[in-house]
Amino acid sequence: MKEVPIARDGSITRVALVVNTRSRTGSRAYNRALELLRGFGLPITSAHPLQDPTRLPETVQEAVDEGNDLVVVGGGDGTISSIVDMLAHREVPLGLLPLGTANDFARTLHVPTDLEQACRTIAHGKIVDIDLGLSGNNYYANRASIGLGASVAKAMSPALKKRIGALAYPVATIRAWFDHKPFFARLTFPDGDHEPQEYPSLMQISVANGRYYGGGQIAAQDSGIDDSTLDISVIRHGGYRELVTVARGFRNGNLLNTDQADFFRTRRVRVETTPKMPVNIDGELVAHTPQDLSVARNALHVIVPRTWVDGR
């Protein structure tokens, strides 16, 4: 960890700013963010307002290749998930501007959603190492999910998120639930820390790296993003009443106290399903089952408030 404020750290001489202007508040935040970061003393050497989110990975990769000491990225959880592959296991830290709908990654790291305070955090915070999840060859920050969570990702249109913000998550969940069909799953644990598990009728499997995901849902009361483990919740299929019970459990972190769920903490898991199911990582459908998921320990350098202690 660095104990010198970032803006006065002599090792930070080149800073790139990359903003997804298609994120919920990205278009109106870009110019103000540039002004604030420079005002706080950060040496911004390149700035990229991107209207095409597909250009985010290549732009961040170029910023790293050009020798920047810090990459500041503005956007939501989908933006962060799309660029962590470029920064994983690299020496270049990430500065975060939460400009999305849910901003669960920022919530886990205690980064303020207020733009000025977020810029202040980048300038005066500290650099820490956190874990990433790994689904196949794809890194993710918050959660991978199979089942209802993947269906919610399909139902979460950019227009819906722009229009109603965080309310888009419960609306999309209800829409997805009506079309959801139960599925069979088998979970195996390569490290032998749990016995293989088979489930004939599931609603969802979640494999969480961060503490928060899905618009403020809590993986577990004691979960953290730097604990070198994944938190897995397996949700049995049920009716509307069971869905409400599960939603409440996720919201307050007490899902373990319901009969609808099983919980596992591990470093690696293999998930097989019938039928073959899409895998959603942080709102993007990137693969299908069978899928191997694991934790990438200390994979990302990121700036957090100086008061941040751990992932809780």
Q: What function would you assign to each model-found segment?
A:
Residues 2-4, 191, 199, 224, ...:
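ATP/nucleoside-binding phosphotransfer catalytic cores, i.e., glycine-rich phosphate-binding loops
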Residues 79-92:
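Short Gly/Thr/Asp-enriched flexible loops that form oxyanion-binding sites at enzyme active sites
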Residues 18, 28, 39-40, 50, ...:
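Catalytic core of DAGKc-family lipid kinases
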Residues 73-77:
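N-terminal glycine-rich "phosphate-gripper" loop used for MgATP/nucleotide binding
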